[in-house]
């Protein structure tokens, strides 16, 4: 079922501009060695204070959590909602979560917290019906049938044309009506009118890579256009053994897809509009990186 955002999550988008300093060099930072170091982020002071004070209570379920409640999808008591950025997205996002995925380890919750109006999370086997809208939807998942983001518009337009042909093949429909419908609805793939994308929703699977097959092979997802992010590398601290570094965490996949969509499909310069999707992720990444460095230093002292 759809998990709609709580009323109090509908906060002002002014939180973004209040803290964010736009950096003109953002496009070059994406390709840097540490892709998280030059993000245009809202102030993370609220997370720093929460980290120092420790776990806090969820105001909905009463559970003890750090930063946010991963079952209620809300910040905890010591993280004021008004200090959490709100991200506006160009597309709707559906996340299909594996039932055995550990909620506390999932990064999908970050998207729901930061873009509640645009993100829905479903727990498998609950999956929306996409069959009638396969020309408006794409699934981000690697595989031999996957295409790159820049080719999405072309392939979705082909689906529209195939659907039109299928409708006009009705033998009971008078031939002159079929011809007229084709003239009205059919367009050349090279025609400038057809180069815009019809994409309205993107689907992500939230699961360990070893568990994704159960969801991916579900008949309700079969036949959807598949998109793969082939050039991005993960920073995830829970990297799964034996998997390539191009296998991203859920929030990384969402973020990088939107960045590439912005430049390759919308044809606009990227200026950090979606960076706050990594608001929690980048903070946790830095915490773990610092802890690891401190641990390595302590180990070094013991071995000398």
Curated annotation (Swiss-Prot):
Gene Ontology cellular-component terms listed: nucleus
Keywords of the record: Acetylation, Nucleus, S-adenosyl-L-methionine, Transferase, tRNA processing
Transport found in the keyword field: no
Catalysed reaction, written as an equation: a uridine in tRNA + S-adenosyl-L-methionine = a 3-[(3S)-3-amino-3-carboxypropyl]uridine in tRNA + S-methyl-5'-thioadenosine + H(+)
Domain of life the protein comes from: Eukaryota
EC number(s) per entry: 2.5.1.25
Sequence positions bearing N-acetylserine: 2
GO BP annotations, alphabetical order: tRNA modification
UniProt motif DXTW: location: 206-209
Keyword Acetylation assigned: yes
GO molecular function: tRNA-uridine aminocarboxypropyltransferase activity
UniProt-annotated location(s): Nucleus
Similarity comment: Belongs to the TDD superfamily. DTWD1 family.
Record's function text: Catalyzes the formation of 3-(3-amino-3-carboxypropyl)uridine (acp3U) at position 20 in the D-loop of several cytoplasmic tRNAs (acp3U(20)).
Protein name: tRNA-uridine aminocarboxypropyltransferase 1
Gene this chain is encoded by: DTWD1
